[in-house]
């Protein structure tokens, strides 16, 4: 336990340092720059800008003259390729076309959803209001389950060609290799590698024991922060982490409490 605690503290410290050093990639996003990017695409801003919560990207609510504000999402450079972002847009637009309540990007007159301005890629979205869902109510969980079921039915109808796949290799072996290269103190490397190897071996056996595991297009980051509750309905936002994965990837982050409580929640969904 002490080993894991020390490794975790070191990792968090390193990640904070790395995050601070990478802040320069967004340093250019001044209010003037943001307004210029929006107006370059034909909208007339009224000068109001409100930064919204986002971990990887930068997201702003921008006021528009005589119209409703828009949401602008500026993508973190080098995180996704253009093809991957466009697959995100296509998937959410496909869901919207099927009358599912998701927030999909807006398309300009040329039919483009991925916009650029002075080296930054961004997309515009309609502003949608709502509150966090109350998942301690069974009826709300059942609504979530029905909507997710429809999302997954459509997700299974086609495949991603460029978005990543959730796998033990990418989320397990590759992550361990990355941490050992840079983040784990040298005196803890051997112990960490031994522990990681044991855990990954167990996971390999578990994965091998599951036959016919179906992979499909999923939201990928389905926690309550990416769900707006309005008019007794769940509205899904931010498909930035959509990927190919089992359907459970969109369910487990909605569960909380004791094992018994989580089982009940899972049954409702």
Report residues per predicted region.
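A cross-family kinase active-site recognition segment
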Residues: 134-191, 215
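ATP-binding pocket architecture of kinase catalytic cores
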Residues: 64-160
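Active-site activation/catalytic loop segments of kinase-like enzymes and analogous catalytic loops
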Residues: 248-269
């Amino acid at each position: 336990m002490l080993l894991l605690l020390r490794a975790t503290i070191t990792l968090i410290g390193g990640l904070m340092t790395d995050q601070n050093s990478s802040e320069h990639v967004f340093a250019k996003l001044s209010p003037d720059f943001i307004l210029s990017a929006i107006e370059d695409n034909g909208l007339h801003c009224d000068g109001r800008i409100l930064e919204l919560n986002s971990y990887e990207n930068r997201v702003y609510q921008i006021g528009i003259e005589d119209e409703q504000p828009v949401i602008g999402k500026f993508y973190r450079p080098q995180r996704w390729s253009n093809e991957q972002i466009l697959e995100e847009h296509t998937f959410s637009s496909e869901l919207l076309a099927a009358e599912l309540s998701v927030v999909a990007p807006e398309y300009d007159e040329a039919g483009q959803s991925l916009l650029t301005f002075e080296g930054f890629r961004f997309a515009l979205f309609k502003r949608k209001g709502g509150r966090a869902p109350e998942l301690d109510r069974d009826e709300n969980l059942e609504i979530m389950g029905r909507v997710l079921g429809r999302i997954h039915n459509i997700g299974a109808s086609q495949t991603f060609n460029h978005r990543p796949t959730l796998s033990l290799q990418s989320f397990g072996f590759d992550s361990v290799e990355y941490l050992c290269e840079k983040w784990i103190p040298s005196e803890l490397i051997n112990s960490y590698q031994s522990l990681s190897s044991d855990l990954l071996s167990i996971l390999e056996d578990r994965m091998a024991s599951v036959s016919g595991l179906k992979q499909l297009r999923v939201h990928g980051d389905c926690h309550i922060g990416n769900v707006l509750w309005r008019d007794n309905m769940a509205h899904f936002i931010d498909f930035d982490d959509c990927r190919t994965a089992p359907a459970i990837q969109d369910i487990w982050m909605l569960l909380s409490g004791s094992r018994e409580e989580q089982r009940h929640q899972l049954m409702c969904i």
